[in-house]
């Protein structure tokens, strides 16, 4: 029986301190070494800062909310999600702005506060800050309004002056591969100078982007990728002035390894005097996973990995921590707040869903007027895929008050496939709904797999519902998702056709739940999620 909130309130300190260990991927080998990726999930454009023995990471979230995930580690290998810095981004938008929003954030610790800067390619440069990264962050401040500015990184100099470097999005302003620097006010809230072009990648280092700004040994350093997400390399640039001129050097590239395009990331100097670099690798439908590389400064340049090529297995950074912990995946929905691993496909509205006193998460069927497919549905409850191979199982109850209300388990990207139950007349159909080119407006196809009698029904006259209790399962391997169901949670039957997963716009495919109402005259149906488990 599910615990009630009264009991949960007493247990919150225990729940908060519980540390999740994944069943499908852990980078810590338990012998003082780690194996990349250290985060085998889609944390695109990661950046990191260190405060004492604590490391904090954030990444791009684009239009998914809550945004700007905050992860914590004590050793750069074992990470857990501790919060989000952005709760709302487009409050006036109902349709998701796929691929827009938060691009390539930068997290810094300055004068007792944590700052995150990011570029929204359509709106400008934004900043949020807090004194407690596990708590509430301030409302976003627009530092510079305008289009095209992306991949921002601040630097507070020794004299207290603040500078900002950023890249530019060709899709918004007509050019890219250049980096510009300007001065901000000392508090970092507004620009006080115009931009100066400090680097042009041209033909040699085309698609230069994602800069991070540092200072070391009297040099101003910019570390950034070039050459594109899937096949690029990592540059380091240095100058005696923040405005250049900068000399550059390639410090990390694929070389003879299988690690394609070691891309954007952040450098960190630990309290033990070690240097490390976190970056992402693009894995297609699985998104942009996070790798950790040692950094060697002996040549005066930050040569990453082993002689400039990525390492796969290596010794762990020095640390007093021996705890193994991973980003959260499974969820029993026993807490009065939604788990930190979940995001909505757009800005959250309360009528999408909420926790309940019965220890289930309740989604309300979303009234979807567009009949072609689910691409523009903001109310999907999704999380990142946690490994190349995994099994996701959900225990669900659908209370359908009218025909055409359905809910179930989905793999979502530019194309999608879902296993759902839909009310048809006085019974339920098990269906596989698939759309391979949802982003192009392709019409969804529907395959009826089974028909069930309701497991329960309301004994009232006013808008009575019929109920379906079911376990839905998705097996993922090799970029394909296959489905199964069970009525007792023990014996599962494979159904439907394997689905070739597709990535989203700038993000990997996501797994989760969907609840839809195509009957606009009825009360909303209810999809109660008892639990969701990754194995």
What are these regions (language model features)?
Residues 1-20:
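Bacterial Sec-dependent N-terminal signal peptides
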Residues 19-535:
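Carbohydrate-active catalytic/glycan-binding domains of CAZyme proteins
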């Amino acid at each position: 029986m599910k615990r009630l909130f009264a009991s949960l309130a007493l247990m919150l300190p225990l729940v908060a301190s519980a540390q999740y260990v994944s069943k499908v991927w852990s980078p810590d080998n338990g012998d003082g070494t780690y194996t990349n990726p250290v985060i085998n999930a889609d944390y695109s454009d990661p950046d990191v800062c260190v405060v004492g023995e604590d490391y904090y990471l954030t990444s791009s979230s684009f239009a998914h909310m809550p945004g700007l995930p905050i992860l914590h580690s004590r050793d750069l290998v074992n990470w857990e999600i501790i919060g989000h810095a952005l709760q709302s981004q487009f409050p006036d938008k109902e349709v998701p702005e796929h691929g827009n929003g938060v691009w390539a954030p930068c997290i810094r610790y300055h004068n007792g506060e944590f700052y995150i800067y990011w570029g929204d390619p359509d709106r400008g440069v934004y900043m949020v800050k807090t004194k407690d990264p596990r708590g509430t962050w301030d409302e976003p401040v627009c530092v510079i309004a305008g289009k095209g500015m992306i991949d921002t990184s601040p630097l507070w100099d020794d004299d207290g002056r603040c500078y900002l470097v950023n890249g530019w999005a060709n899709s918004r302003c007509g050019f890219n591969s250049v980096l510009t620097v300007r001065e901000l006010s000392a508090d970092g809230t507004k620009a006080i100078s115009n931009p100066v072009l400090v680097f042009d990648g041209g033909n040699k280092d085309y698609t230069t982007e994602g800069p991070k700004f540092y200072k070391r040994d009297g040099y101003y350093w910019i570390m950034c990728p070039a050459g594109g997400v899937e096949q690029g390399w990592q540059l380091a640039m240095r100058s005696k002035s923040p405005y250049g001129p900068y000399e550059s050097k390639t410090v990390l590239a694929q070389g003879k390894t299988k690690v394609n395009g070691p891309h954007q990331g952040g450098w960190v100097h630990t309290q033990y005097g070690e240097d490390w670099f976190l970056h992402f690798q693009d894995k297609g439908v699985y998104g942009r996973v996070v790798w950790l590389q040692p950094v060697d400064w002996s040549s005066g340049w930050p040569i990453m990995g082993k002689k400039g090529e990525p390492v796969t297995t290596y010794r762990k950074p020095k640390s007093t921590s021996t705890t193994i912990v991973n980003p959260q995946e499974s969820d029993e929905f026993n807490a009065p707040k939604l788990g930190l691993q979940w995001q909505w496909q757009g800005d959250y509205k309360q009528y999408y869903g909420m926790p309940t006193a019965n220890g289930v998460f309740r989604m309300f069927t979303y009234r979807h007027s567009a009949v072609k497919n689910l691409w523009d549905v903001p109310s999907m409850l999704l999380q990142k895929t946690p490994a190349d191979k995994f099994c996701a199982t959900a225990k669900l109850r659908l209370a359908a008050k009218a025909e055409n209300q359905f809910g179930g388990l989905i793999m979502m990207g530019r194309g999608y496939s879902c296993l759902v139950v839909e009310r048809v007349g006085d019974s339920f159909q098990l269906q596989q709904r698939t759309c391979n080119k949802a982003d192009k407006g392709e019409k969804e196809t529907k395959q009826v797999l089974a028909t069930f009698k309701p497991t329960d029904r309301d004994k009232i006259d006013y808008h009575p519902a019929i109920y379906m209790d079911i376990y839905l399962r998705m097996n993922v391997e090799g970029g394909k998702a296959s489905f199964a169901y069970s009525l007792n949670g023990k014996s599962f039957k494979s159904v439907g056709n394997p689905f070739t997963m597709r990535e989203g716009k700038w993000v990997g495919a996501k797994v989760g739940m969907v609840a839809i109402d195509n009957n606009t005259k009825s009360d909303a149906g209810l999809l109660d999620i008892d639990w969701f488990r990754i194995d």
